[in-house]
Amino acid sequence: MRNPPPALAPTRRTLFASALGAGGWIGLSLAGRAAAQTAPAAASPAPAGGREPLFEISLAQWSLHKLLYGGELDALDFPRFTRETFGLGEVEYVNSFFKDHGADFTYLADLRQRCADHGIRSGLIMIDGEGNLGAADPRERRKACERHFRWISAAAFLGCRAIRVNAAGTGTPEEHSQQAAESLHALAEVAQDFGQFVLVENHGGRSSDGSWLAETIRRADHPRVGTLPDFGNFQIEAGVWYDRYLGVEQLMPFAQAVSAKSHDFDAEGNETGTDFRRMLRIVLDAGYRGPIGIEYEGSRLPEVEGVRATQRLLERLREELAAAR
């Protein structure tokens, strides 16, 4: 799809202007672009034996959602907490934890400085609750695109490489796919000016059908549109699951990030619902060498312990798989 339909074609300046007003567009554009060029790089620990690791490990903010929603952890302290508690050097934000601050550059500057203070790199922002990019009504899709624009600028300001979006929508599978693809193309036209990718996660509904999502990405036909494969989000509807290993394999050709979803662990430290070794082989065989994000969602272990268990598993398998290559 080289040219999106007229309903979504005027996306770059005109949609920004309608969403933010001329002054808002100028402020967001200058702040986001300048930050994208000057964002601080986080220090990474030297790999054991002087070898480059097969992948870095990052932490998705959702892993600590109970602590954050419960008031035990402030979103601004997430970078410090990540470094001091887990020794990790990259984070993935969720907009739900600072939804009122997407265009608040005082807040974002504070968050960015805290990342710099603790040697933390900002990877991406996961965007939820900003409208259905695959809606049947083009006006609804346009509004959803507009609501995502501030997060593109915020991501650039923080030094991220991407935003993660959802492909929820309506219609037949074919209609839904085409509608979502149009919105993704429109968002990517803006995102490329900020050095950002627009990534779709398998996140329930049709997006958890790996074949459907892969085809939607192909239809979007933009180098800045990609995927964020999640190891566990393959429930299409109640009682209907897509094969998670097939799904990740289908999404990896477009991947710019990967989410290692975990829930529980056995006595040997292996995840009980997903064969992480098999998943990591799929990821690595696709040629991916970017960060893999911990996203713990379990209930038996407290969040901090669940993150640590996931981290230990990823580190162990990283060494095992590196030795076999």
What is the predicted role of each segment?
Residues R2-G87, S207-R325:
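Histidine-acidic metal/acid-base catalytic patches
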Residues A19-L30, A42-E52, R80, R114-P229, ...:
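Active-site acidic/histidine proton-transfer and metal-coordination neighborhood
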Residues G89, R121, R161, R289-G290:
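Short acidic/polar active-site loop segments enriched in Thr and Asp
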Residues E90-E92, L124, R164, S259, ...:
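Conserved beta-strand positions in the central sheet of alpha/beta enzyme cores
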Residues E92-L111, T170-G171:
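Glycine-rich, proline-tolerant flexible connector loops at the mouths of alpha/beta enzymes
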Residues E92-Y93, V198-H203, A267:
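Short catalytic-loop micro-motif centered on adjacent basic/acidic residues
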Residues H101-A109, P138, E175, E303-G306:
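Metal-dependent catalytic neighborhoods of phosphoester/phosphodiester hydrolases
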Residues Y107-D117, S183-L187, G247, M279-I282:
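Catalytic-core regions built around general acid/base machinery
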